[in-house]
Design a protein with these regions (language model features):
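Non-catalytic interface/targeting segments
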Residues: 1-67, 74, 101-123
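Mid-chain, well-packed structural core segment of small domains
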Residues: 61-97
Length: 123
């Protein structure tokens, strides 16, 4: 499962205005912080990626949505404050799991690491 590859690291895209708190709706986010999680559970900011808001003035742009999903296609997870069903479906089609969570980024990443370890555990 996932996009981890041989080294087992993976990426998490976080929608945030300040780099501290998960506080952006997927469709309104103009920037994602890309966090790399190593196989030992440590994580760090890899980069930021600028996106075009797919939802502006009550209108949705499928073109912007598809571009944003493609831009995040190397990520295993996306953390946002909210996400609509269409965006979640588009991410899922690319193998990306979205979580709607409003919390500090560090705390949210720690929860995703626990989740990731549980679903990828081999007995």
């Amino acid at each position: 499962m996932g996009k981890e590859g041989a080294n087992m690291s993976y990426k998490i895209a976080v929608a945030s205005t300040d780099g501290k708190v998960v506080n952006q709706h997927f469709g309104r986010a103009e920037k994602f912080y890309i966090i790399e999680v190593s196989d030992d559970g440590t994580f760090c900011l890899e980069t930021t990626r600028e996106t075009s808001a797919a939802c502006t003035d009550g209108e949705h742009s499928d073109d912007s949505l598809n571009k944003n999903v493609s831009l995040l296609s190397d990520c295993s997870y996306v953390l946002v404050s909210r996400i609509g069903p269409g965006a979640e479906y588009a991410l899922n089609k690319k193998g990306i799991t979205a979580f709607a969570i409003s919390n500090y980024i560090d705390k949210s990443i720690e929860k995703i690491i626990i989740y990731h370890d549980r679903i990828n555990k081999t007995n």
